[in-house]
Structure formats: structure tokens, C-alpha cells
């Protein structure tokens, strides 16, 4: 039992800074929305529309680079720190290639926005302007993620927390300058949010670059030592590990986006209640997501040390801690659901709808914790292809179809509206949790030589 307690402490020490870093990123989006909304409702809506296109694109790149964390953790655990710099340099090349692809997609996103049904032309122009501004921050964001993944692979999660918080503080005055046109800058409104956020991503990268070159714990990792040409074999391996994770993230983000579109014809009350419940559950999701990052680090590090048993302890401990936290957040959600809904909106009908959906949100928090932490464990084992197949099956073949049938049709029961889609979320996330758990169990039953060879690949 003692080893599980020690492992739990290590996991929480890694996870807490990740939570704070994620909150900083979320708060940056909230600040953009509030400050754009102070100009006009059109500017706020333009930021929302632009973000709905930007987020899946940049998260795809983010997911692709997550392969670096277990790679660095495994090299660190096995005492091969001299190989880390080369992996990170190739991570930069991969980030550069992906950022170019993302910028091309975002630059041409005006075709998507202009074809949206009944979209206001002014709103469309502002949304396109927002995207054309923020896309220049794509390389900065992904370069920052490369160095953040290096630090996290070395069990250093605090730098990402500190720099994320500084990024939030920097974002506010830059927003102020470009949204309202201060100090000689043009008043860009919602487009200014894109300029500010893109700038902040580069600032965060430069701060992280400054940290890794001066941190005593990383003096032996010489990133700046000469020019490193692309190593296509390493890039292919990193891309092969990261692509399933990137696609899994893309499936998850687009699932919620599609459900939002399907709910939109059901009326203002349904849409508002759905959005409130989804926003709050997304905040609660940050806790197990941070444990997922910690699980990847700990499992990868233990496998690097050649200890399959310790990796198993790290995996089970992370899931157990996640379940305990999920029980707390689920109880909190059930008890205070009406009070939480009132913080968002005072309309009685909306509060009733949101409160009802939060009951379902509380129900799926347990399975959500298992599936997201399970995904982190599998990343630690470098078993990322299974993550892709599990998420695709659970979300798109089980969750979304069942939600659609329950929410909008009378085939099974009378159409349930938003509640039907949330039951679909429960089905999808529970299916993912079961499949993740089964995959982890299967993997841990394999011979130690097989597990270690897979992790060392």
C-alpha cells in the first residue's frame, strides 16, 4: 500500500501545475470573449465562430506533438538523456511542418465561414479576420508545446504552469491595445483578439526557450548545439506515435461541435442549457486530464527504468486517484447544480434545463476520468494506435448515433432533446472507459520483454 501512496503523491505533484496551466489557457479564451463582447455582440460572435475552427486545427498539432512526452520520459528513465536533444530537435521540425499545414488550412477557412447558413456578412468578415490574425501564432504555440513536452517528459511541469499564467497576464494588455486601438494601434475589435493571442503564443515560446537553456536540471540537453537537419526516421516515428492521439483529440472536439449544431434547432432554452452544462463539465474535465499527463510521464519513466511492475503501479494509481477526484466533483455537481447554473443565467427555464443536464454530466464524470487517464497510461506505454480506434468507436460509432436516436427521433423513445444527446455522451464515454481499461489490462498481461521493447521503440 505504501508504494501506491508514494506514487499518488508523485502523480499529484506533477498534475497540479498542469491543472493551473490549463486553467490559464481556458481563462485566456474567456478574456477574449469578454473583451470582444464589450465592443459588440457581433465581435464576440466572430471570436466564437473563429475559435470553433481554430481549436480543432491547433489541437490536432498539439496532439501530434504529445508523442514527445513519453519519448523523453522513457529516455530519461533509462539514463539515455544524451539522446533527448535530438528527439526534441526533430520535434521542432515536426511542429514546423504541421504549423505550415495548419496555417494553409486556416488561411482558406473563409470558404467554410462564407458558406455557413444565414451567417451575417459583417460577422463572417470579422471571424475571417480573427483567423487570419491568430494563424501566425500557430508556429509559436507548437514550438512552445515542443519545449513544454520536453520539460514534462523530464517530470518538470511547473514551467508550463508559470509561463501559462504569465501568458494570460500578457494577453490582457495586448488585447486592450489591439481591440480598442490604444497607443497608436488600430481598433480591430474581435480581430484584435487574434492578433493578441497569436503574439502571446510567441512570447510564451520565447519564455520557455529562455527557461530550458538556463535550467540547471537541463544543462546536459544541448538543443542549440549546431544545426540539426530533419531526421525523417525520427520524425516518422514521432508522427506515427502522435497521429493517433491527434486524431483522437480531433474526434472528441468535433463530436461536441457536431452535437452543438444538432441541438441548435431545438430552441434558445435547449441551446443555453446545453452550453452551460458543457462549459462547466469542461472545467471539471481539467482535473482528470492533468492526471492523464502525469500518468504518461510516470509510466514512461518507469518503463525507461526497465520496471514493468512500477509502471503498472503508476497506471493503477493514476486511475484510482482520478476516480476519487471524479467522485468528489460528481457529488459537487449534483449538490450545487442549480447554484452553478444561476451563475451563468438567471432565466428559470434555462436553469432547469442546465440543472437536469448536469445530473447526466455528474454521471459521466466517472467514466470520463477512466477514459482520459487510461489514454494517458496508454501513451506512456506508447500504445497510441489503440487510443485512436477506441475513441473513434466509442464517440462516433456508439455515442453520437445513440445520442441522435434518443435526442431527435422517436425510434426508441419519444425524442428527448438535449437530454438524449447527453445520454449519448454517457454511452460514448463509458464505452471508451471500458475499452481503455480492457486494453491496459491486456497490455499488462504481455511478457515484460514485449512491453519494454514497445516502450523503447
Swiss-Prot record:
The chain crosses the membrane at residues 11-31, 46-66, 93-113, 127-147, 160-180, 188-208, 243-263, 278-300, 316-336, 350-370, 387-407, 418-438. It is found in: Cell inner membrane. Pfam families: MatE (PF01554). Coiled coil: none annotated. GO terms for cellular component: plasma membrane. GO terms for biological process: sodium ion transport; xenobiotic transmembrane transport. The keyword Transport applies. InterPro entries: MATE_fam, MATE_MdtK, MdtK-like, Multidrug-R_MdtK. It is a multi-pass membrane protein. Keywords: Antiport, Cell inner membrane, Cell membrane, Ion transport, Membrane, Sodium, Sodium transport, Transmembrane, Transmembrane helix, Transport. Its main location: membrane. GO terms for molecular function: antiporter activity; xenobiotic transmembrane transporter activity. Belongs to the multi antimicrobial extrusion (MATE) (TC 2.A.66.1) family. MdtK subfamily. NCBIfam families: matE. Multidrug efflux pump that functions probably as a Na(+)/drug antiporter. This is Multidrug resistance protein MdtK. It comes from Yersinia enterocolitica serotype O:8 / biotype 1B (strain NCTC 13174 / 8081).
